[in-house]
Amino acid sequence: KNNTNQGASSDYYFSEYQFQKRFDNKLTLTSGAMSSYTLVKSQLYGDHNSTNIAGYIQGDKKWNKFNITAGMRMEYFKIDSVQSKGKLFNTDLNIPFQPVFRFGATYQPMEYTFLRASYGQGYRFPSIAEKYISSAVGPLNVFPNPNLEPEYGWSAELGLKQGFKIKNFK
C-alpha cells in the first residue's frame, strides 16, 4: 500500500505501421505512421491523457560513389486540450502539427574513404509528468509548470571516415 500520496497508474496504447519499397534505380522509400495514447491517474500530477500521432517518409538514393538521404516527419501531440503548434525556423505556422526534416549525404572519393554531412531537426513535446508534477520532499518542492513549451533543436555534422587495409584485414 502506498501511503505517501504518490501513487500512479497509467494505460499506454501504441501502434505503428511501416512500409518500404526498393526501386531498380537504387532508390528506397520508407514511409509509415504511428500513434500512441496514454491515460494517467496520479496523485503526483493529477489525471491527464496524451495523444501522439505521426506520419513520416524518407528517401535513400545511391549514385555510384554518392548516397543521399532526405526525410520528413509530421508530429501531432496533445495533452488534455493543449496540442502541438507547428513552427518552422522560428516562424509560427497555422497548423496543429510539427514538421521535422532531416538530410544526409555521403561521398566515397577513394576506396576506404568516406566524406559525410548531415542536418536534422529535433522536436520534443513535454511529458505529462514534466508539466504537472507537484511534490515535496523535506525542504525541496517541485511545482507544476502547465505552460511548459515544446523543445526545438537542430544538429549538423561534417565528417571523414578513413578505413585501412593491411593484407587481408580491413
Outline where the language-model segments fall:
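Face-selective signature of the C-terminal outer-membrane beta-barrel domain
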Residues: K1-T91, N168-K170
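Outer-membrane beta-barrel signature, preferentially recognizing the C-terminal barrel domain
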Residues: T91-Q108, Y112-F114, S118-K170
